[in-house]
Amino acid sequence: MPFSLEGKTAIVTGSGRGIGRAIARRLVAAGASVMLNDLDEHMLQESRESLSDPERVDVIAGDLTDPQVPAKVVNATLNTFKSLDIIVNNAGYSWDNVIQKTSDEQFQAMLDIHLVTPFRLLRAASAHIKEAAKTEMAAGHRVMRKVVNITSISGTDGNPGQVGYSSGKAGVIGLTKTLAKEWGRYNVNVNAVGFGLIETRLVQPLDAEGASMEMHGHHIRLGVQPILLDSVKNACPLGRLGTPEEAAGAVLFFCSPLSDYVTGEVLICGGGLHF
């Protein structure tokens, strides 16, 4: 590996499964300590146990759409690891419908998890990031920190039937570009990775086991129609869905020193697919 993240500490939200778990695995393999967060405490423990060095991993379960939880995640990370260098805002889910069938609650839920949650987490981390940077610069050191927000080609291109999801994923791009300009003076790279269709429970067949979730009293169906999956594969230049490991590779680039002079950008990791 052409770089090491030894001595760095990361937060990865939505890391109980799928892409989030794969991101955490990449970061730990590169030498970082990682705080995992997810709604599902059982899946969090599974993630921790699956990593190569669980001694450098801690977990904090909690619903990030609770206004108090993002700050708790940041504080737990600082209390455990005494530093914070990398934040990956990965948590999310899809609750889909066309606009005329989308309730205010459904639309707001998509904004809350995909836009408001990253905002709150980054706001909670801002004091530590700024003070650490000021101390480092006063000593003549440049220490780069990293923020990676997860978006989607639904946010960059729009996608019929995903009015809430697409809006939240588009909004986080604006957050990314604005924070890149606000935090550049503190040596923070703020970028986004936009995924196409990756092999997670969000794109499994509708009738597959586990193709649903419970959220705030609602039973939410996940996945897509099998015929649509075939259509998407045919439209994708690479002819297949991506794997969580491939998705995590794109995120790792933005977490690494290889991206030290890249900020405010959106990297699409979708096999060439656009809606």
Task: Give each language-model segment a name.
Residues 2-4, 157, 234, 250-253, ...:
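Short C-terminal tail/terminal secondary-structure segment
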Residues 3-35:
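Canonical Rossmann dinucleotide-binding motif of NAD(H)/NADP(H)-dependent dehydrogenases/reductases
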Residues 83, 184-189, 262-264:
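Short, small/polar-rich loop/turn modules that mediate ligand/substrate recognition or access, typified
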Residues 98-99, 103-111, 232:
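Substrate-binding pocket helix/loop in short-chain dehydrogenase/reductase
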Residues 122, 168, 176:
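Active-site helix of classical SDR
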Residues 127, 181-182, 260:
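Alpha-helical segment proximal to the catalytic Tyr-Lys
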Residues 152:
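Residue(s) in the substrate-gating loop at a strand-loop-helix junction
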